[in-house]
Regions:
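Glycine/threonine-rich phosphate-binding loop and adjacent beta-strand/alpha-helix elements that clamp
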Residues: 1-217
């Protein structure tokens, strides 16, 4: 069967004090809705300086499971982490992220990566996804859905669940030059100012397919 019938689709909400840059920032991943009505995080996406691909379902020496700590120190990557788990957590099935976003680009990309943070703070990628958001100019935050690759992974006791949000994953995915032109036709790139909202009205979150443990009783 797929997905598993006993799957409990569980939303984990992103939250911060307005600075989710880098693991040392205030980005949090929680089961409760964010409380701050004006909360958001922002970053600048420059297509000339894309986030380099580090692991994932691609070819080459950087494919597969890869340490993410260097990527997470970039100023154009937002990082949200849970508390250390008190018991193992299995995630098996499809994964989606619902983000409420604003941008000043006519077209841009949004990327989400699910990460397992070990007790020594080493971070490893689990799966990721990307969405090309065209006709993106809006005055109010717009909901988007980023579909990540399905996975089957157990986060062990003492580990933390983390997601990274950015606007590029190159060269695995082609850069969006933020111009609205296709990759074939584009000749000029534009810098995009990106904003992610996490409020009671705009509760950005990732939905994990949690598999409850089977009791031995």
């Amino acid at each position: 069967e797929w997905p598993l019938r006993r799957t409990q689709y569980t939303p984990y909400y992103i939250d911060s004090a307005g600075d989710a840059h880098r693991p040392a920032g205030s980005g949090r991943l929680t089961l409760g809705l964010p409380a701050d009505a004006g909360a958001s995080d922002a970053f600048v996406y420059n297509p000339k300086q894309p986030v380099p691909s580090a692991g994932g379902a691609m070819l080459g020496p950087r494919a597969g499971v890869y340490i993410q700590n260097e990527i997470e120190e970039r100023s154009d990557v937002l990082v949200y982490s849970s508390q250390a788990l008190e018991e193992p957590l299995e995630t098996t099935g499809p994964i989606t992220a619902v983000l409420y976003v604003k941008t000043d680009a006519v077209s841009t990309d949004w990327t989400v990566k699910l990460v397992d943070v070990h007790p020594d703070s080493t971070a490893y990628n689990i799966c990721d996804g990307i969405l090309r958001h065209s006709y993106a100019l809006e005055r109010t935050p717009q909901p988007i859905k980023v579909v990540l690759w399905p996975t089957s992974h157990v986060f062990l006791t003492g580990h933390r669940i983390r997601i990274e949000i950015s606007s590029s994953n190159f060269p695995r995915y082609d850069r969006n030059l933020n111009s609205g032109d296709t990759s074939v036709d584009a000749t000029v790139s534009h810098i995009a100012h990106q904003q992610i909202y996490h409020t009671p009205r705009y509760p950005s979150h990732i939905v994990l397919p949690v598999i409850p443990a089977i009791s031995n009783r």
